[in-house]
From Swiss-Prot:
Record HAMAP family: PGAM_GpmA
GO molecular function list: phosphoglycerate mutase activity
Entries under InterPro entries matching the protein: His_Pase_superF_clade-1, His_PPase_superfam, Phosphogly_mut1
Residues the entry annotates as binding substrate: 8-15, 21-22, 60, 87-90, 98, 114-115, 183-184
Residues the UniProt record annotates as site (Transition state stabilizer): H182
Keywords of the record: Gluconeogenesis, Glycolysis, Isomerase
Protein name: 2,3-bisphosphoglycerate-dependent phosphoglycerate mutase
Alphabetical list of CDD domains matching this protein: HP_PGM_like (cd07067)
Reaction(s) this enzyme catalyzes, per UniProt: (2R)-2-phosphoglycerate = (2R)-3-phosphoglycerate
Cross-referenced SUPFAM superfamilies: Phosphoglycerate mutase-like (SSF53254)
Alphabetical list of Pfam families matching this protein: His_Phos_1 (PF00300)
Family under the similarity heading: Belongs to the phosphoglycerate mutase family. BPG-dependent PGAM subfamily.
Pathway listed: Carbohydrate degradation; glycolysis; pyruvate from D-glyceraldehyde 3-phosphate: step 3/5
Amino acid sequence: MPKLVFARHGESEWNLANLFTGWADVDLSENGTKQAIEAGKLIKEAGIEFDIAYTSVLKRAIKTTNLALEFSDQLWVPVVKSWRLNERHYGGLTGLNKADAAAKHGDEQVHIWRRSYDVLPPAMDHDDKYTAHGDRRYAGLEDSLIPDAENLKVTLERALPFWEDQIAPALKEGKNVFVGAHGNSIRALVKQIKKLSDDEIMDVEIPNFPPLVFEFDDNLNVQNEYYLAPKKA
């Protein structure tokens, strides 16, 4: 029974500062590093052995993936990085304190931007200091593929080809898969995996820790879903 382990990146410096992050390439906080290490230890304790790992091109997810593999004694496992697993792009909200954004735009409007399935936040200008246009890690992409803002619907549309081309085939081959990604890219894939409605996915939260495990049958029907937890003494 193949397993898929989702690990949202550990707490980032901007999580700690309560800032909208999106595609901004911020680092893990000290606590986030500890969370990633603990994720690896939980994976080792659970006896889960991976055949392949996937992550985004953002350092907080890459570092979480590397630490989780290192502390589960699986640092040799191949890791594939893809922009399609990046966090949702928060557009012009990127870098703003969430409380300041609410004060400027109103609590209700910010809540809609954050939590609705298909409402886009304000677009990011191409000359914004956090723009992905011109960033070397996206040099191989057509400029039209680089977003200026995303909602969860668009995030799923971006992530879905990677699920269909990479992750799902690996699982169908019986491989155990690790995905180190982000709250909203994981939520998008969970919607696909569990066949959730647009309304149902809005109530799903993905914590920075611990990792989330799915077990599948040969047709990728979910047989079990659980968060890893320390074994009781």
